[in-house]
Amino acid sequence: GDIYAGYWEEGKKSGHGNFSYINGSYFFGNFENGLANGWGFSITKDNYVTLCEYAFGDTKQCTNPETGEEFSVLENRFEAHSEIDRKNIQEKLTDIGFYQEDIDGLWGRDSFAALLKYASLEFESIALHEPLFANQILSSLLGLNLRNKN
C-alpha cells in the first residue's frame, strides 16, 4: 500500500512528510493538523513534477517547475559543474534509487525529479531555488562514497 514517512503530532501528520504511493508516484510536503499546508510537490512514476501551495488541504496554486523560474537556480548550478561531476551526481542518485535513466551528465526532467527526491528526504526541504541550498545538495552528492569501485 501507500507509505507515509514523516512526523506525527497527536495522531495527525505534522511537519515534513512524504508519501510513496503504490502506483509509483511520490509526494513531499508540509503538514499541519493532518492536512497538506504550505508548499509540496508531486512526482509521477514517469518523473513529471507538479509544485503546489496548500492551505490546510486545499490547493491554492500549482505550477510546473520545469517551465517556471522557481528552480532554474538548481539547473544552473547543476550545469555549472563539469561533465564528470554531473555524471557523478547522476551516478550517486542512481545508487540511492532516485535516478533510473542513462548517466549522461545532462539536465532533464529525470535529473530534476531525482534531486527533488534527494533534497526532500535527506534535507527535509525543497528550497532548491535558493543558491546556497542548491549548492549544498549538489556538493553533498559529490561527497558521497557509495560505489565500491575495484
Language model: regions and residue ranges:
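Conserved anchor residues at repeat-unit boundaries in beta-strand-based tandem repeats, strongest
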Residues: I3-S14, Y26-N37, V49-P65
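Cell-envelope/ECM-targeting effectors and their regulatory/trafficking segments
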Residues: F28, K45-N150
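N-terminal start-of-chain detector that recognizes signal peptides
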Residues: I3, K13-G15, S72-V73, H129
